[in-house]
């Protein structure tokens, strides 16, 4: 089997594995009593990750350069990064819900690369002069890893929003009381007592005694989130924060490396190219997220909404601006 045939086999195998793994994770969420499904899902993601790593290695051997020169190669590198960060996040959280939301992202990326791109884009070609630099590996690989990490962190924030929908809560370690799970008014969400409380309203009868005027049955507010869902929400919020905290410095390093490379290649550190502009917007969005978490003490839905918007911004930065075919970063894509 030559390297080209091996690559064709591995890209289709990666897509098929991730598709089946996505179904396994979804089945595990629908039938939580089937305890072996999450383990099978994790195994599937690990095998898919290995397939994509082998694909990129074969591509490197065939072409003679690090495989990040066009859309096909960068998509598979991105999918490899998403699956790698998925394994880290799943190990940290011990929750199968991570796979429920991350495997569709990885599967969609591989489907786009393996099934949608034209054959000429899936074959390796000589590097354009601008890419013949050692900065290709340094800049592009770090940027792609940052995209993958931020995507996983953002999609976990989206999962948090779904789990806590219609309920504005503050999580453990909040500034309200001594922590615990509380709604935005500070009411504990774990002391969910469905019993009615009878309140006796009394009045003096003028002879030293009391007379009951009325008995009122007070039913506590019904809490929509079970303790299990609240624990899951806390885990998702924490893991999302930590994963984004890992992706942000990678994005920062990637942008700095790109500026140095741009100065060597084009004589300017910053040209306000569409890709550069959206990279800055992406950096600002996640900088605002981390600033709100670290200095303002935001937790729960407000920072999760900001992180969820970052998922869209990352995709616009990575893929959207290149659909225009304009700017210094348009080579190797559609036009």
Swiss-Prot record:
The keyword Kinase does not apply. Pfam families: Cytochrom_C_asm. Keywords: Cytochrome c-type biogenesis, Membrane, Thylakoid, Transmembrane, Transmembrane helix. NCBIfam families: cytochr_II_ccsB. It is found in: Cellular thylakoid membrane. One of its GO terms (biological process) is cytochrome complex assembly. Its main location: membrane. InterPro entries: Cyt_c_assembly (IPR002541), Cyt_c_biogenesis_CcsA (IPR017562), Cyt_c_biogenesis_CcsA/CcmC (IPR045062). The keyword Iron does not apply. Belongs to the CcmF/CycK/Ccl1/NrfE/CcsA family. This is Cytochrome c biogenesis protein CcsA. May interact with ccs1. Required during biogenesis of c-type cytochromes (cytochrome c6 and cytochrome f) at the step of heme attachment.
């Amino acid at each position: 089997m030559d390297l080209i045939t091996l690559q064709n086999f591995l890209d289709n195998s990666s897509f098929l594995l991730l598709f089946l793994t996505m179904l396994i994770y979804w089945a595990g969420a629908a039938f939580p009593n089937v305890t072996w499904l999450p383990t099978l899902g994790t195994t599937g993601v690990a095998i898919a990750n290995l397939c994509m790593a082998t694909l990129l290695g074969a591509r490197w051997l065939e072409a003679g350069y690090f495989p990040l020169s066009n859309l096909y190669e960068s998509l598979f590198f991105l999918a490899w990064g998403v699956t790698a960060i998925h394994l880290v996040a799943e190990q940290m959280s011990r929750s199968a819900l991570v796979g429920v939301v991350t495997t569709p992202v990885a599967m969609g990326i591989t489907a786009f690369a393996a099934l949608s791109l034209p054959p000429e884009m899936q074959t390796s070609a000589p590097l354009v002069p601008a890419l013949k630099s050692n900065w290709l590996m340094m800049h592009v690989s770090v940027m792609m890893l940052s995209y993958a990490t931020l995507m996983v962190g953002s999609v976990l924030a989206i999962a948090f929003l779904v789990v806590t929908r219609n309920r504005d809560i503050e999580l453990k370690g909040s500034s309200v009381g001594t922590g615990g799970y509380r709604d935005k008014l500070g009411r504990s969400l774990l002391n969910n007592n469905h019993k009615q409380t009878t309140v006796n309203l009394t009045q003096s009868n003028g002879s030293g005694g009391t007379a009951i005027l009325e008995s009122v049955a007070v039913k506590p507010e019904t809490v929509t989130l079970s303790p299990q869902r609240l624990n899951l929400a806390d885990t998702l919020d924490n893991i999302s924060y930590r994963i984004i905290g890992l992706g942000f410095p990678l994005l920062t390093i990637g942008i700095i490396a790109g500026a140095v490379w741009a100065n060597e290649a084009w004589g300017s550190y910053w040209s306000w190219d569409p890709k550069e502009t959206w990279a800055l917007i992406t950096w600002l969005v996640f900088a605002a997220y981390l600033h709100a978490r670290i200095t303002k003490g935001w937790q729960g839905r407000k920072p999760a909404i900001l992180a969820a918007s970052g998922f869209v911004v990352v995709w616009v930065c990575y893929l959207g601006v290149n659909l225009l075919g304009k700017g210094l970063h348009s080579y190797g894509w559609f036009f």
